[in-house]
Amino acid sequence: MISIEGLKVEFGTTPLFEDVSFVINKKDRIALVGKNGAGKSTMLKILAGLQQPTEGVVAVQRGITIGYLPQVMILSDTRTVMAEAEMAFEHIFEMQEKLEKMNQELADRTDYDSESYHELIERFTHENERFLMMGGTNYRAEIERTLTGLGFNRTDFDRPTSEFSGGWRMRIELAKLLLRRPDVLLLDEPTNHLDIESIQWLENFLKMSSGAVVLVSHDRAFINNVTNRTIEISCGRIYDYKVAYDEFVVLRKERREQQLRAYENQQKEIKDTEDFIERFRYKATKAVQVQSRIKQLEKIVPIEIDEEDTSTLRLKFPPSMRSGNYPVICENVKKAYGDHVVFHDVNLTIHRGEKVAFVGKNGEGKSTLVKCIMDEIPYEGKLTIGHNVQIGYFAQNQAQLLDENVTVFDTIDRVAKGDIRLKIRDILGAFMFGGEASEKKVKVLSGGERSRLAMIKLLLEPVNFLILDEPTNHLDMRSKDVLKEALKEFDGTVIVVSHDREFLDGLVTKVYEFGGGLVKEHIGGIYDFLQKKKMENLNELQLSQSPQTASPKKEEPAESESKLSYEAQKELNKKIR
């Protein structure tokens, strides 16, 4: 479908990657991985035809359509949600308009026996059959399925897109892209603005899709569930594995060990050669051999080793005083903005040492309850913070509180105490501030970089109760592993607001579900909760489809039927008639 040959991209004089070649085939589900700045988003832009490589060729098979979802895009505010989603079916509307004109012409004409009239009937029949095959009569149902799958309520369909946040408008763009059903989908961080239910829906959609998918994501569970091939960009090269991400991690570790052995052998060879040259440089009897060794040394191509895997780095929180038995107790807590009730009658008790997750669709009040606990906003009811509780709070706006005039290294050096100061550079590297990045001033950092720095700073402060609101948003998978292990070893209490299943798995032992103005407690881990939710949804479906009330459901044609060839569909229609 797409062939990439000899690709090279340079920024200034430094190549981002070079001599990159691979092929994207139908049904490929490719995870494009690598550290931040390796060139993943650049690769997607090149595949989408939005950026030209310095060298090389991207050949797209004739007739192949490509759909691209960037991390950031310009969004329209002039239409309703439904009208915006309908833009994916412009070709249907064009066909509909054409059919209406042809139909009107047939109605106006009276030369029923003429050859041109019969030709018009044939053209109309042909176009009408194409229109039906392309979903001309059921496109609206497809839009509704996609929008609800991505978390919209039916009451949202007629609301203007300007009423929605940037994250929700990105969902509309994703819906339009999926509805167009391109042959190749290029997705850059598609789960960034999705909740768990929407992520699971997207997973199922992509797995059922007949085209190819190339995606960049830091959601490990998502890429494991969707992909069957992993392409890593590392040290300016690519490594192509025909396996899902978890298996790739194992193979990558083996590859790095082999590289390390080869590197050590090469270094020994270089040292031995240099020693020989130095020892016999001024001996006339060895002149030929010395010159030979010098040429040999010049021909050696240095072996590069992949970036060090920082996931084995262990962080330990500094000691803090022991808190009371119940760090947080909520009694009949309610929060409303005017007539809009976010939640009501919230009753929960979090015990010392518990690690709990707040989950639910966006806008259901997870971050709002966190702000109530932090006493940042007023609320109704009673909310008690326990004895000796020292809260460490992370939210995206915490990054704004950093001192802009100091470096990344100094920001962390100011809070680090004891032996941990010897590991500052390792810690910074684990959170993608390796090398020269640690000497950058805070004021030149991007929003995502500032968030990561605020997270590191929090990890080194002595607290006994952590509240983390979307802590993994700007972390790569290795950074998330480091953070997760640190939290697992933390002996205090933790509340995590997150949609990242892989991050929550094995970390939390209780889940609070936000939805419909209520907060429900579920004992167990995130996958226990999701399994229970799946069963509840099935039970609700069975109840709503009980024999007494269920109406017979018209079976929808399978996707493969809707994509039959024109002649085959024509024959099928004859048989039906």
Residues of each region from the PLM?
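Intracellular alpha-helical coupling/juxtamembrane segments of multi-pass membrane proteins
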Residues: 251-276, 280-300, 304-306
